[in-house]
Design a protein with these regions (language model features):
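Blade-loop segments of beta-propeller domains
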Residues: 76-106
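A short helix->beta-strand "capping" segment at the edge of beta-propeller domains
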Residues: 26-34, 188-194
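Blade-terminus and WD-like Trp-Asp/Gly-His loop motifs, strongest in beta-propeller folds
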Residues: 40-47, 93-103, 141-148, 204-212, ...
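Beta-propeller fold detector
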Residues: 78-82, 129-133, 192-195, 242-246, ...
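Short loop/turn segments that connect beta-strands within beta-propeller blades
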Residues: 72-75, 122-126, 187-190, 235-239, ...
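Bacterial N-terminal signal peptides
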Residues: 10-21
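A flexible loop/linker signature enriched in serine peptidases of the S9 family
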Residues: 32, 52-66, 83-90, 107-119, ...
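Serine-hydrolase catalytic core recognition
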Residues: 351-653
Length: 653
C-alpha cells in the first residue's frame, strides 16, 4: 500500500507542466532540499552521474530534474543540457556508463506524455546524441559486453510504471490485455525484445557473458501481479524465458536479483513485502546451472534492502537492522556465514536498489546519504568510509533533537524515532505518524521545509514508530501482523507512546495521529479503537477492507496478508475494517486522498468521512483532482500541509 519512496503525504512523483510556476509559500527557494534520485559511478571511478533537483515544499521528489556529471577528484560539476529544457516532466533517468567510461546513456521523458527517448553524452557534456524515440516508458539501462544497451520498456504505455502513479481512466473494456514491460536491447536504432510478450518484467540483471538476463516477472497486469512474480532466465538471442525459482509460500515476494561476477550464481531478496519498490527480507542465492535456493541469512534480525557483488565476487547487502542502516559482507554466497559489518550508521544510504554504485577493481563506491538532521549529499569512499562529494545542501538544518527509542510489546522489541523541538517549554503535544506499507520502516531522512518542520517549529513533538509488520527486525517481525491488521501493531504503537512519555515531557492529553496509505488505514482504525487521540489526519486510508478488495487496482497484495480472498474469508477482512466500528469514533478527523488513487481509492476516504459526518464527529475531507497515491502537484501538497497544521492547531493547542 505504501512504498519505501512513499511517506504518506510526502510522495511527489509527477506534476502537470502548469505547476512549473508554483512557488511554495511556506519556504524560501534557497531553503528547498536538493535531492539525488539516482547516483551512478563510472567504471574507472573518475565520474559520478546523478539525477537530482530541488524538491517542492512538503514533498520528496523534484518536479524539475537535472542530469549532472561530477569529477570524483575535484567535484567539478557539469550539467547536461537536456533537449526538452529545464521544465517539469522533462525527466532524465537511469544513467548508465559504457564499459570504457567514455559515454553515459540515459532516458528522457517527453513532457506531458508517457513516451521516452534514450540519449548518449560524453563525460564533459559534449556529443549529446539521441539513440531512439520510443512510444512508451523506458528505464533501467545497462550496457552489454558488446556495447549495446539493454532496458526495461513498455510499448504504448498508458501510464507511468508503478501502482503509486495516477491511474488511467477507468473506462472501456476492463478485461483488455494490459501492456507488458519487457527487456529490450537497443540495436541500430530499434528495440529487439529479449523477454516474452506475455510477461511483465519488474527487475533484471545481466549475465556477464552477454547471452541473457536474470529477472523477476509475472504475467498480466504489472501493477497487480508483482506479489506472485517468479525468477526467470531470459535469452538475449530469442527472448525466451525459463522459470528457475517459483516461491512455494504466498508470503514470499522476490526482489533485487543480482548475478555474480563469475556468472555462476544469482542472489536475490525474498520475504513478505507489501509493495514493489519497498524491499526487505532474507538473502537467498541460487546456482544458475540448477539447484535449490539457499537462505544465507536465516533468522537474521535485520531486513536486506539491496544487494551487490563486490570486486572480489563477494555478496554485499545493504540492510536495516533496528535503528541502523548497514553494509554487510555475506561471503561467496554458497552458505550462511557470519556477516561482516562494513559500515553502520543512523542514516540512510541511497534510494532502494540503487543505493550503492561500485567501481572495480578500485572498490570505490558512490551513494547519497542523509539523516534526520543531515541533508542529502553525494558521498564516495571505500570500505564504508564516506567522504562527501557535494555541499549543495550545506546550511540546511532540522529544528529537532532526535532520539531512537526501544520498548517491549507482546514479547517483541520495537523501535521508533522521537523528534523534539529544539526549545522545550513545559509539556509538549505529540503527533504520532504511522508509516505506509505495512512492510516498510520509517528511517532517518531529511525532510526540509514541510509538515515535519512546521510542526516542530510550532512546538509539537513527533513520534515515528516501526511496529510489527515493519522492516528492520527480521522476517518473523515483518510477518507478525498477518491476519491481524490493526490489532498487534496498534498495541505496539500505544506502548511506544507510553515509552516516549517516559523519556520526554509529553502531554498525554494532547495526542495527535496521522499517516498515509497503510498509515492512513491505521489512523482510521485507531480512532475506532481508542479515544486517546484528540485529533487525527488520515491520508489515502482504507475504511472497509471488504469493499476495498474490489475497488483497488492491486488486490493481489492482500492474499499474503489475509490468507485468502475476501470472497473466501470475509470475516478476516471484517475484523480489521474501521467502518465496522465507526460508531466508537469521537476523535476529530481530517482525511484527504487523490482522485485517481488506485492503491487506496478515494471511495474509501469518502466512506469514512460520510460516516463521521452522519455521526456528528468533527470531520473534513479533501479529494485532490487528478492525483494518484500520494500528492504530486506542489499546490496540492502545500494545501494538504496547511489543512493538516490547522487541524492539529485547532484541536491540540
Amino acid at each position: 500500500m505504501g512504498t519505501r519512496k512513499n511517506l504518506g503525504w510526502q510522495v511527489a512523483l509527477t506534476c502537470m507542466a502548469a505547476a512549473a510556476s508554483v512557488q511554495p509559500a511556506w519556504a524560501a527557494e534557497d531553503s528547498l532540499v536538493h535531492r539525488f534520485l539516482q547516483v551512478e559511478l563510472s567504471p574507472d571511478g573518475a565520474f559520478v552521474a546523478s539525477v537530482e533537483g530541488d524538491s517542492p515544499v512538503n514533498a520528496t521528489y523534484p518536479i524539475v530534474r537535472e542530469l549532472v556529471i561530477r569529477s570524483v577528484a575535484t567535484g567539478a560539476r557539469t550539467q547536461i543540457a537536456l533537449p526538452c529544457g529545464h521544465v517539469p516532466q522533462c525527466w532524465p533517468g537511469s544513467p548508465a556508463w559504457s564499459s570504457d567510461h567514455e559515454h553515459l546513456s540515459f532516458t528522457l521523458r517527453k513532457p506531458g506524455s508517457h513516451s521516452y527517448s534514450v540519449y548518449t553524452v560524453s563525460p564533459d557534456g559534449s556529443n549529446l546524441s539521441k539513440q531512439i524515440d520510443f512510444d512508451g516508458t523506458v528505464g533501467d539501462l545497462h550496457y552489454l559486453p558488446d556495447g549495446k544497451l539493454s532496458m526495461l520498456a513498455i510499448e504504448g504505455a498508458r501510464k507511468e510504471v508503478g501502482a503509486t502513479e495516477a491511474g488511467a481512466a477507468v473506462a472501456g473494456d476492463l478485461d483488455a490485455a494490459p501492456p507488458e514491460q519487457r527487456i529490450g536491447i537497443l540495436t541500430a536504432g530499434a528495440v529487439h525484445w529479449a523477454s516474452p510478450p506475455d510477461l511483465f518484467v519488474y527487475e533484471y540483471d545481466l549475465r556477464p557473458d552477454g547471452k541473457g538476463f536474470v529477472g523477476t516477472a509475472s504475467p498480466g497486469d504489472g501493477d497487480n501481479n508483482w506479489w506472485t512474480a517468479k525468477l526467470y532466465t531470459f535469452s538475449a538471442a530469442d527472448g525466451s524465458g525459463q522459470v528457475i525459482y517459483s516461491p512455494t509460500d504466498i508470503r514470499q515476494q522476490l526482489a533485487s536479483p543480482k548475478v555474480s561476477r563469475d556468472g555462476t550464481t544469482v542472489a536475490f531478496i525474498a520475504g513478505l513485502m507489501s509493495d514493489f519498490g519497498s524491499t526487505g527480507g532474507d538473502v537467498y542465492t541460487l546456482p544458475l546451472k540448477g539447484g535449490e535456493p539457499i537462505n544465507i541469512t536465516p533468522e537474521r534480525p535485520a531486513s536486506a534492502r539491496a544487494l551487490f557483488w563486490n570486486c572480489h565476487n563477494q555478496l554485499v547487502s545493504e540492510e536495516l537492522a533496528g535503528d541502523k542502516d548497514q553494509l554487510v559482507v555475506l561471503g561467496a554466497g554458497h552458505e550462511p556465514v557470519k556477516a561482516k559489518v562494513l559500515w553502520s550508521g543512523s542514516e540512510t544510504l541511497g534510494r532502494g536498489d540503487t543505493s550503492i554504485s561500485l567501481s572495480c577493481p578500485s572498490g570505490l563506491m558512490a551513494t547519497s546519504r542523509e539523516s534526520f538532521t543531515a541533508p542529502p549529499q553525494i558521498a564516495t569512499g571505500t570500505g564504508g568510509k564516506w567522504k562527501d562529494l557535494t555541499t549543495v545542501n550545506a546550511g540546511l538544518s532540522t529544528p529537532a533533537r532526535v532520539q531512537s527509542i526501544q520498548w517491549i510489546s507482546d514479547g517483541f522489541t520495537v523501535q521508533g524515532w522521537l523528534l523534539l523541538p529544539q526549545h522545550v517549554d513545559g509539556k509538549l503535544p505529540l503527533i504520532t505518524t504511522v508509516h505506509g506499507g505495512p512492510a516498510y520502516a520509517l528511517v532517518p531522512s531529511f525532510r526540509g521545509p514541510g509538515l515535519q518542520q512546521k510542526l516542530l517549529e510550532r512546538g509539537f513533538a513527533l513520534f515515528y514508530p516501526n511496529p510489527r509488520g515493519s522492516f528492520g527486525q527480521g522476517e518473523r517481525f515483518t510477518a507478525a501482523n498477518v491476519k491481524d491488521f490493526g490489532h498487534g501493531d496498534l498495541r505496539d504503537i500505544l506502548a511506544g507512546i507510553d515509552a516516549a512519555e517516559k523519556v520526554a515531557p509529553i502531554d498525554d492529553a494532547r495526542l495527535g495521529l496521522t499517516g498515509g496509505s497503510y498509515g492512513g488505514f491505521m489512523t482510521m482504525w485507531t480512532v475506532t479503537q481508542t479515544n486517546r487521540f484528540k485529533a487525527a489526519v488520515a491520508s489515502a486510508g482504507v475504511s472497509n477492507w471488504q469493499s476495498y478488495y474490489g475497488e483497488n487496482g492491486i488486490d493481489a497484495w492482500m492474499i499474503p496478508y489475509f490468507g485468502a480472498s475476501v470472497y473466501e474469508d470475509p470475516a478476516v477482512y471484517a475484523k480489521s475494517s474501521p467502518i465496522n466500528f465507526i460508531t466508537n469514533v469521537r476523535t476529530p478527523t481530517f482525511a484527504y486522498v487523490g482522485e485517481r488513487d488506485i492503491e487506496c481509492p478515494a471511495a474509501q476516504t469518502q466512506e469514512f468521512w460520510h460516516a463521521l459526518k452522519a455521526l456528528g464527529v468533527p470531520t473534513s475531507v479533501m479529494i485532490y483532482p487528478g492525483e494518484g497515491h500520494g500528492l504530486r502537484d506542489p499546490a496540492n501538497t502545500e494545501d494538504a500541509m496547511r489543512r493538516t497544521v490547522e487541524w492539529f492547531d485547532r484541536y491540540l493547542k
